[in-house]
Amino acid sequence: MFMPDSIQLHLLQPGQRATITRINGASALRRRFIEMGIVKGETILIERNAPLGDPVEYFIKGYHLALRKEEAAQIDVILHEGANG
């Protein structure tokens, strides 16, 4: 189910903060996300892009992680108000 204000994580820019609303994709990928702490309701901060734009570094639950844009496209989020860096 698509939430009206939700967007895919890979569309956000460094400095933006969002709340995870849905995890899509194959069950193996969803399981991997859960193991990394990427779950519905968590806040995630977009830290920075790699020099060529992929992967992107995120900050969640007190640690940094990098996801490829194709992986981040499977995560729906709601952008926080005033979340531009």
Model-derived regions: residue spans:
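C-terminal regulatory/oligomerization modules of transcriptional regulators
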Residues: 1-13, 80-85
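Short alpha-helix capping/helix-loop boundary micro-motifs
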Residues: 5, 28-32
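Short, surface-exposed secondary-structure edge patches
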Residues: 9, 33-37
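C-terminal structural segments of small proteins and small subunits
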Residues: 53, 57-85
